[in-house]
Amino acid sequence: MGQILSNPVIDKESHSGADSLTAFGLCAMQGWRMSMEDSHILEPNVLTKSDKDHIAFYGIFDGHGGAKVAEYCGNKIVEILQEQKSFHEGNLPRALIDTFINTDVKLLQDPVMKEDHSGCTATSILVSKSQNLLVCGNAGDSRTVLATDGNAKALSYDHKPTLASEKSRIVAADGFVEMDRVNGNLALSRAIGDFEFKSNPKLGPEEQIVTCVPDILEHSLDYDRDEFVILACDGIWDCLTSQDCVDLVHLGLREGKTLNEISSRIIDVCCAPTTEGTGIGCDNMSIVVVALLKEGEDVAQWSDRMKSKAHRTSVRSFADKRRRVFSYYDFSKCNDEQVFAITTKKPQDKFTRDHEAAVASVTAADNDDPMDIDDTDADTDAENLDPSSQSKSKTSGPIDLASLEALLGATGGVKTDSNGNKVTYTLPQSALAQLLQTMGHDPASSHPENDSNTDHKAGRSHLQ
C-alpha cells in the first residue's frame, strides 16, 4: 500500500472547460499518500484555428517511485505529440505510439531526468472532429472508459505482469514475475520512465522488460449513443468498476451537478474513511470526465440531453455507493453527508481564526513598511557583485506594536502575579516563529536544509 499519512490531504485540484468539440471536469486529490504523484493534460484543441481539423487531447499520468516522470509528462507530452510527423499526417494511432516512445527518449536525453528512478502510467485519448474518431493510448493500469447508451465500454486494458502476453515479453527480456510483480518490484508491466527495466541495448522499446509502448484502441464516434469518456488512475478503479463510474456520472448529471462537481464527488466516494481496512481508497486520486458534444451543442444542452436518456442504474446515491465500497466500516450512525466526513473540510474554530488574522496583520505590517525592501533579482545581482554584502544580514523594519499586541492577545495567554504587576505571554510555536521573523530573526534561517525550492506544478490545463 505504500507509506500513508495519519490524516488525508483533502485539498483538491480542479479544472473545467469546454469548446465546440468536448467539455471536461477534472478533480485530483493527494489523499492518504505521503505525496501527490499524479499529473494530467487537458487540451480541448491541440491544433490552431487555421488547421483543418479540431483535435482534443486528454490524459492521466499516475506516478510511482516519485512524481518527476509524471510531472514531466503533464508538462511536456503535448509538445512531444505536436512534434510527431505521424500527428501532422493525421495518423492518430501511430501518433500516440510515437509520442509515448519519444517521451522516453527525451527523458533519457534530459541530464536531470535520466538519473530519476520514477515512472508513470499513461492513459490518454485523442478526439478528432474531421475523422469522427476517438483514439485511446494506454500504458499501465490507469484506465479509460467510454459511456455508450449508459453502458461502460473499455477503451483500455490494465497492464499487469501476470497477463500471459505481458509475462511472455518480460521473461523473453530476461526478467521474471514474482509475487505478481515485475522482478518482484513493479506491480504493472508498461510505463513511461522506469529505466532500470529498459536497460537492454539489444532490444527495441516494445521488447523491454517494461515497455512504454501503449495499447491502441480506435472508436468511430456515434454522437447519438456515445456520451462521455472517463479517464482515471487506479486510485479510482480500485474502488469502482467501470460501470459504477459511468452510473455515478449519470447520477450526478440527474442531480444537476457540473462535470467538475461530479469528478469531485466520485473522489469523495473513493477516499477511505480509515487506513485500517483493506488498503483501497488510500491512493492518490485523479479523474477527468470528458463530454462528447454534438455539432453546435454546448455543455448545458449536452447535460439536458444526458438527463433525458433516463438510464437505469443500480446506484441509488453517492452516499449509498460509498457505504457499499467500504462495507467494513460502520456508517450506521452517519447520515448521507456525514458519510463523507473524511473529505469534508472542518470549519475553523475561533482560536484558529483569531490566530491567522493576527499573523496576517503582522505580516502585512511588515510587508508595508517602507524600510523593508524586497529582495529583487536586481538586489541579488548587486549583492553578488559586492563580496562584502555576503556577510551582511537582512533586518526587517520597525515592529508594528499594535500588530504585535494583536498577535500576543489573539494567540497567547496573558498572566499576572497576585499583585497584578508581572506579565507573562505564552505563545504557540507558530506564533513565536512569526514574531521572530518579524524582528529579523527567522528561526529557519539557521537551517539551510529546510529552504527548498520545490516546483509543485502537477499538470497542464489550457484552453485555446
From Swiss-Prot:
<feature type="binding site">
    <location>
        <position position="283"/>
    </location>
    <ligand>
        <name>Mn(2+) 2</name>
    </ligand>
</feature>
<dbReference type="InterPro" id="IPR015655">
    <property type="entry name" value="PP2C"/>
</dbReference>
<feature type="compositionally biased region" description="Basic and acidic residues">
    <location>
        <begin position="448"/>
        <end position="458"/>
    </location>
</feature>
<feature type="region of interest" description="Disordered">
    <location>
        <begin position="434"/>
        <end position="464"/>
    </location>
</feature>
<feature type="region of interest" description="Disordered">
    <location>
        <begin position="361"/>
        <end position="398"/>
    </location>
</feature>
<dbReference type="InterPro" id="IPR036457">
    <property type="entry name" value="PPM-type-like_dom_sf"/>
</dbReference>
<comment type="similarity">
    <text>Belongs to the PP2C family.</text>
</comment>
<feature type="compositionally biased region" description="Polar residues">
    <location>
        <begin position="386"/>
        <end position="396"/>
    </location>
</feature>
<dbReference type="GO" id="GO:0004722">
    <property type="term" value="F:protein serine/threonine phosphatase activity"/>
</dbReference>
<dbReference type="InterPro" id="IPR001932">
    <property type="entry name" value="PPM-type_phosphatase-like_dom"/>
</dbReference>
<feature type="binding site">
    <location>
        <position position="62"/>
    </location>
    <ligand>
        <name>Mn(2+) 2</name>
    </ligand>
</feature>
<keyword id="KW-0479">Metal-binding</keyword>
<keyword id="KW-0597">Phosphoprotein</keyword>
<keyword id="KW-0963">Cytoplasm</keyword>
<feature type="region of interest" description="Interaction with IRE1">
    <location>
        <begin position="174"/>
        <end position="355"/>
    </location>
</feature>
<protein>
    <recommendedName>
        <fullName>Protein phosphatase 2C homolog 2</fullName>
        <ecNumber>3.1.3.16</ecNumber>
    </recommendedName>
</protein>
<dbReference type="GO" id="GO:1903753">
    <property type="term" value="P:negative regulation of p38MAPK cascade"/>
</dbReference>
<dbReference type="GO" id="GO:0005737">
    <property type="term" value="C:cytoplasm"/>
</dbReference>
<feature type="modified residue" description="Phosphothreonine">
    <location>
        <position position="376"/>
    </location>
</feature>
<dbReference type="InterPro" id="IPR000222">
    <property type="entry name" value="PP2C_BS"/>
</dbReference>
<dbReference type="GO" id="GO:1904289">
    <property type="term" value="P:regulation of mitotic DNA damage checkpoint"/>
</dbReference>
<dbReference type="GO" id="GO:0007165">
    <property type="term" value="P:signal transduction"/>
</dbReference>
<dbReference type="GO" id="GO:0010508">
    <property type="term" value="P:positive regulation of autophagy"/>
</dbReference>
<dbReference type="GO" id="GO:0046872">
    <property type="term" value="F:metal ion binding"/>
</dbReference>
<comment type="function">
    <text>Dephosphorylating regulator for many key proteins. Dephosphorylates the cell cycle master regulator CDC28/cyclin-dependent kinase 1; its activity appears redundant with phosphatase PTC3. Dephosphorylates HOG1 at 'Thr-171', to attenuate activation of the stress-activated p38MAPK cascade; its activity appears redundant with phosphatase PTC3.</text>
</comment>
<feature type="binding site">
    <location>
        <position position="63"/>
    </location>
    <ligand>
        <name>Mn(2+) 1</name>
    </ligand>
</feature>
<dbReference type="GO" id="GO:0005634">
    <property type="term" value="C:nucleus"/>
</dbReference>
<feature type="compositionally biased region" description="Acidic residues">
    <location>
        <begin position="366"/>
        <end position="384"/>
    </location>
</feature>
<dbReference type="GO" id="GO:1900102">
    <property type="term" value="P:negative regulation of endoplasmic reticulum unfolded protein response"/>
</dbReference>
<feature type="domain" description="PPM-type phosphatase">
    <location>
        <begin position="23"/>
        <end position="292"/>
    </location>
</feature>
<keyword id="KW-0378">Hydrolase</keyword>
<dbReference type="GO" id="GO:0005829">
    <property type="term" value="C:cytosol"/>
</dbReference>
<feature type="binding site">
    <location>
        <position position="234"/>
    </location>
    <ligand>
        <name>Mn(2+) 2</name>
    </ligand>
</feature>
<dbReference type="Pfam" id="PF00481">
    <property type="entry name" value="PP2C"/>
</dbReference>
<keyword id="KW-0460">Magnesium</keyword>
<feature type="modified residue" description="Phosphothreonine">
    <location>
        <position position="380"/>
    </location>
</feature>
<keyword id="KW-0464">Manganese</keyword>
<keyword id="KW-0539">Nucleus</keyword>
<feature type="binding site">
    <location>
        <position position="62"/>
    </location>
    <ligand>
        <name>Mn(2+) 1</name>
    </ligand>
</feature>
<comment type="subunit">
    <text>Interacts with IRE1 (when phosphorylated); the interaction is direct and serves to attenuate the endoplasmic reticulum unfolded protein response. Interacts (when phosphorylated) with RAD53 (via domain FHA 1); the interaction is direct and serves to regulate DNA damage checkpoint signaling. Interacts with the ATG17-ATG29-ATG31 and ATG1-ATG13 supercomplex; to regulate induction of autophagy.</text>
</comment>
<keyword id="KW-0904">Protein phosphatase</keyword>
<dbReference type="GO" id="GO:1990439">
    <property type="term" value="F:MAP kinase serine/threonine phosphatase activity"/>
</dbReference>
